[in-house]
């Protein structure tokens, strides 16, 4: 399986393979760290414990730090507890954190590492499909606040990312489906081959022994190319937020009870409809969004009667400038543009179209 190079001021590799613990330990040794903390989630304690024992056997002072599962772990309170623990363990600027888990764990681990002593090394070991193709690659870290998702954070690149596809065996099907939304996103913005694979055999796209490893690699290749050119989202990197403006508003309204990928799927349909209203894309391309997403069981509609709440959520999006709502939109496959300042009427019309299938 491939190794993907992320080229930046601090280049690093994304390793995609099976049984990668030995390589993780070797990388930790070569980092110069004496102390290593694995930040993980309760369901993964056994697997994290196996890695911790291997680190200890290699002569590293290793620790496991369990944080609350999912988005409930991405808070300032939880980050504070992590920093307190690092202090008790005597972590210095030369030490290392390993983020081991889903996207919430890797986001939190990266943020904790970015802030401790103004930045210590971090290795990311994503264990969910969503984290593999989205959260763990690119150096974005963050926590949530009452005002929105990931509004507090830092850009802090890992020294390595290890994607062990064996972790996919333990994931429920609905988690594989939700994570696939981020892969499909990269297909629309940069890699038509991804879309073709889903259209040809959607079932195989959900299988570790089918197309899924290739899709993971293709999606990461898209993201790594973008991140290599624009680490801090000053321009090009914004294209990775396709579907996220409305998606994040849905997550906020649902109090983060929706899976991120499901919200992004609906967000892609929303912005496709908005682009269609603006005359940027055809009815056929909007329908292609729906068909591909629905082919693997992702949602493409949203309940009505909540426009004002969602509108407020979109107003808090990080891409906005001067109080203007800005969307990443398409003119065609792999042809991405900014859609700025839509009217309330246009937004409401796009929102209303999300209910057409439900009526």
UniProtKB/Swiss-Prot annotation:
EC main group: lyase
Top-level taxonomic group: Bacteria
Enzyme Commission number(s) from the entry: 4.2.3.4
GO biological process, one term: chorismate biosynthetic process
Keyword terms, alphabetized: Amino-acid biosynthesis, Aromatic amino acid biosynthesis, Cobalt, Cytoplasm, Lyase, Metal-binding, NAD, Nucleotide-binding, Zinc
SUPFAM superfamilies xref list: Dehydroquinate synthase-like (SSF56796)
Subcellular location: Cytoplasm
Binding site for Zn(2+): 182, 244, 260
Gene Ontology CC terms: cytoplasm
Residues binding NAD(+): 69-74, 103-107, 127-128, 140, 149
Note on how the cofactor is bound: Binds 1 divalent metal cation per subunit. Can use either Co(2+) or Zn(2+).
GO molecular function terms noted in the UniProt entry: 3-dehydroquinate synthase activity; metal ion binding; nucleotide binding
InterPro entries: Dehydroquinate_synthase, DHQ_synth_AroB, DHQ_synth_fam, DHQS/DOIS_N, DHQS_C
Catalytic activity: 7-phospho-2-dehydro-3-deoxy-D-arabino-heptonate = 3-dehydroquinate + phosphate
Pathway: Metabolic intermediate biosynthesis; chorismate biosynthesis; chorismate from D-erythrose 4-phosphate and phosphoenolpyruvate: step 2/7
CDD domains (alphabetical): DHQS
Segment forming the signal sequence: none
Major subcellular location class: cytoplasm
Family assignment from sequence similarity: Belongs to the sugar phosphate cyclases superfamily. Dehydroquinate synthase family.
Function: Catalyzes the conversion of 3-deoxy-D-arabino-heptulosonate 7-phosphate (DAHP) to dehydroquinate (DHQ).
Protein name, as recorded: 3-dehydroquinate synthase
């Amino acid at each position: 399986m491939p190794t993907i190079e992320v080229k930046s001021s601090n280049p690093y590799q994304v390793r995609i393979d099976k049984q990668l613990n030995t390589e993780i330990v070797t990388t930790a040794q070569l980092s110069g760290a004496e102390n290593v903390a694995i930040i993980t989630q309760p369901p993964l304690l056994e697997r994290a414990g196996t890695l911790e024992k291997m680190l200890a056997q290699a002569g590293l002072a290793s620790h496991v730090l369990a944080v609350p599962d999912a988005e409930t772990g991405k808070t300032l309170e939880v980050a504070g507890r992590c920093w307190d623990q690092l202090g008790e363990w005597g972590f210095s600027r030369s030490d290392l954190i390993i983020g081991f888990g889903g996207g919430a764990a890797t986001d939190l681990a990266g943020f904790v590492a970015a802030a401790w002593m103004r930045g210590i090394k971090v290795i990311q070991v994503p264990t969910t499909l969503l984290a593999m193709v989205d959260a763990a690659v690119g150096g974005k870290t963050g926590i949530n606040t009452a005002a929105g998702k990931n509004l507090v954070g830092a850009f802090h690149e890992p020294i390595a990312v290890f994607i062990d596809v064996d972790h996919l065996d333990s994931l429920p099907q609905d988690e594989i489906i939700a994570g696939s939304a981020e892969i499909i996103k990269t297909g629309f913005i940069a890699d038509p081959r991804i879309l073709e694979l889903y259209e040809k055999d959607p079932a195989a796209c959900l299988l570790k022994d089918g197309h899924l490893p290739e899709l993971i690699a293709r999606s990461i290749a898209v993201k790594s190319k973008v991140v290599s050119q624009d680490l801090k989202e000053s321009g090009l990197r914004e294209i990775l937020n396709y579907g996220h403006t409305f998606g994040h508003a849905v997550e906020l309204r649902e109090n983060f009870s929706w899976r991120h990928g499901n919200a992004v799927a609906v967000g892609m349909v929303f912005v496709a409809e908005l682009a269609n209203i603006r005359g940027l894309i055809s009815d056929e391309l909007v329908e292609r969004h729906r068909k591909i997403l629905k082919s693997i069981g992702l949602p493409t509609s949203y309940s009505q009667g909540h426009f004002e709440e969602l509108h407020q959520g979109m107003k808090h999006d990080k891409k906005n400038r001067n109080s203007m709502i800005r969307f990443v939109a398409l003119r065609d496959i792999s042809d991405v543009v900014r859609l700025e300042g839509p009217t309330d009427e246009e937004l409401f019309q796009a929102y209303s179209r999300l209910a057409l299938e439900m009526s």
